[in-house]
Amino acid sequence: MKLGISITGGGALGIGPLQFMRRLEADLGKKLASVGDAFAGTSTGSIVATGLANGMTAETLYNLYKDNLPKIFKKVSSTRILSKSYYRYDNSYLKKMLQENFKKHMYEFKKPVYIPATFLNGKSVEKVWGKDDGD
């Protein structure tokens, strides 16, 4: 039997599932990365799924979130939101943190990871990319 682990989104609330996963790893006596055969996540859950697919422990991911939450979820000004941009957070620190802590290419992951994505224009839904689909 194969086991897929899916993690929900929720921005800064993504730390909640990580608290549960830390406890689960402690109870199991092993990393979820070694238990799951594939990982999936939406939004902030995709970051957690990517970490697990790279062999990181829930504890490592929890600490990464805890130490970086204020910088990742630093709100942008309301003027910027009302202009051409529709996002509420500046992603520059998040991008830097991901580049420093995660593998650069999906084919380098230890396990398959699946991350749904779409264009924000609402006109189309694109393919869900996985480990075997290249970059």
Show which residues each predicted segment covers.
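Patatin-like phospholipase
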Residues: 2-6, 11-101, 127-129, 135
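Active-site gating loop/helix substructures
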Residues: 108-135
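Short secondary-structure capping/junction motifs at helix and strand boundaries
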Residues: 75, 103-112
